[in-house]
């Protein structure tokens, strides 16, 4: 690894890779062991439910006719490029922002892979209480949400991001 990568936030790409492996492995396990729309209750408020999401969060645009696959893929590619660029400019010591960008990057790439390979995103984590159901999601979605929460945390508590000069 180059000296620049050792000093920049790019060293945090290990976190993205780890989350990508967990996301891919969990989706592979669900697809290989469950039928589409099958649900396995694990707790009174939690089940594994295999579904396809053709849209974005909360199935937004899922009935848009197919163009959304490429539109959402283009957005994910652009955001991923931007996140890598930001990581390159951040010092590796800026742990909160580096972790946040790496988590969002992992989620974007994890869902991008599904969208390009299959035309939909594989979701399976189902949380509910009585008749109230949260939309089914996946590990990539968790990474994006945790990354976004870290970005908010940093916005309220962190210092201004300092650019790394090579």
From Swiss-Prot:
Which compartments is it annotated to reside in? Cell inner membrane
A Gene Ontology biological process noted in the UniProt record is: proteolysis
Give the membrane topology, semicolon-separated if more than one.
Multi-pass membrane protein
* A single cellular component GO annotation: plasma membrane
Q: Which family does it belong to?
A: Belongs to the peptidase A8 family.
Q: Does the keyword Transcription apply?
A: no
Q: Source gene?
A: lspA
The active site lies at: 123, 141
EC id: 3.4.23.36
Give TM segment ranges.
11-31, 42-62, 67-87, 90-110, 133-153
For this protein, the record's InterPro entries field holds:
Peptidase_A8
Matching entries from HAMAP family are given as: LspA
Task: Kindly tell me the pathway this chain contributes to.
Answer: Protein modification; lipoprotein biosynthesis (signal peptide cleavage)
Q: State the Gene Ontology terms under molecular function.
A: aspartic-type endopeptidase activity
Output the PANTHER family linked to this UniProt entry: LIPOPROTEIN SIGNAL PEPTIDASE (PTHR33695:SF1)
Quickly give the catalysed reaction: Release of signal peptides from bacterial membrane prolipoproteins. Hydrolyzes -Xaa-Yaa-Zaa-|-(S,diacylglyceryl)Cys-, in which Xaa is hydrophobic (preferably Leu), and Yaa (Ala or Ser) and Zaa (Gly or Ala) have small, neutral side chains
Spell out the protein name for this chain: Lipoprotein signal peptidase
Q: Does the keyword Transmembrane helix apply?
A: yes
What organism is this sequence from?
Pseudoalteromonas translucida (strain TAC 125)
UniProtKB keywords: Aspartyl protease, Cell inner membrane, Cell membrane, Hydrolase, Membrane, Protease, Transmembrane, Transmembrane helix
The top EC class, named as a word, is hydrolase
User: What functional role does this protein have?
Assistant: This protein specifically catalyzes the removal of signal peptides from prolipoproteins.
């Amino acid at each position: 690894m180059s000296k620049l990568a050792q000093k920049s936030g790019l060293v945090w790409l290990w976190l993205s890779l780890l989350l990508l492996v967990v996301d891919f492995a969990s989706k592979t396990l669900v697809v290989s062991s469950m039928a589409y729309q099958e649900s396995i209750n694990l707790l009174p408020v939690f089940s594994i439910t295999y579904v396809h999401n053709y849209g974005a969060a909360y199935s937004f645009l899922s009935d848009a006719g197919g163009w959304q696959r490429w539109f959402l893929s283009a957005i994910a590619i652009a955001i991923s490029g931007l996140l890598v660029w930001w990581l390159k400019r951040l010092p590796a010591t800026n742990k909160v922002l580096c972790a946040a960008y790496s988590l969002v990057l992992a989620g974007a790439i994890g869902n991008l892979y599904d969208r390009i390979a299959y035309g939909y995103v594989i979701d399976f984590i189902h949380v509910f209480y009585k008749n109230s159901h949260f939309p089914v999601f996946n590990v990539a979605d968790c990474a994006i949400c945790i990354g976004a929460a870290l970005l908010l945390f940093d916005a309220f508590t962190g210092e201004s991001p300092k650019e790394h000069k090579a």
